[in-house]
């Protein structure tokens, strides 16, 4: 049974930013009715427009600005690029809007702009337009970034083509970005040596012409929320195997200490792919061939023999099946 909600709140709460059920309710009840059109159907990470163009937009409010493995600049580039990649598009161009708080150190801004330049070069995209605004001290938190991305369509995600037996490929270990950002805040006095996985996913582009059915980058809400949302769209269930899901030892240890389930932690350089059963082995090998994908695993499958249609099930280490729900409240605010 899916979670129910309390009456509509009068104010937006921080929990809405989780990327889970509360965010989905806000979108369904307020945003989609205001702008409903065919391009928004299914809430894609990027919309496919006439002329073979894909278009996406994103906002970044991460706190702190700098964290092990990256900063708000690398995050802005890679987050936008990855939304295009998993939508079946080769990234080409970005826009960049900066909202600066009065008092921001110009040295920090210079460092972030350098990160943006390097990340864009690595992802083979160009920043071609932008805007800059400055607000009074206290009216923003140092720096916010808003991007848009344009790419060339080379494949089309199609949840409607997913069939029982299709395999789920996870491209790498979970949770590294969320925990790197959280530990960088210093709130818990932990030093787990965790680095963000923030990186572009361009190496997955060849999987589209090879027959990948569907992809998503694992951002807010984590793997469990993303696959729950996929399962809800299918006339089948989705099963993932706990013993196949890669989680690094530092992430697992820190998550256990903090009482956090890694299945709900965000990444910024990982994706989950639905592959046809006959092509899954070749696709897994292709992912593992790239340094970012060397720890990729087949973690489960689409099935009609376990659970009910629309459910996401975890085959646990103890041998049982556990129903996984989408995230309902914020675990770690402002991680992207």
Residue positions per predicted region:
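Short Gly/Ser/Thr- and Asp/Glu-enriched loop/turn motifs at secondary-structure junctions
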Residues: 43-44, 265-270
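N-terminal amphipathic/basic leader segments beginning at the initiator methionine
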Residues: 1-30, 321-332
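Active-site-proximal betaalpha loop/short-helix elements
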Residues: 101-103, 194-267
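Acidic, Ser/Thr/Pro-rich beta/coil linker or hinge segments at domain junctions
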Residues: 290-336
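Helix N-cap motif at beta-to-alpha junctions
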Residues: 275-281
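Short amphipathic alpha-helices in soluble, non-transmembrane regions
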Residues: 282-292
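Glycine-rich phosphate/pyrophosphate-binding loop regions near the starts of catalytic domains
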Residues: 13, 18-170, 176
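Phosphate/diphosphate-binding glycine-rich loops and adjacent basic-rich segments that engage nucleotide
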Residues: 152-201, 313-314, 334
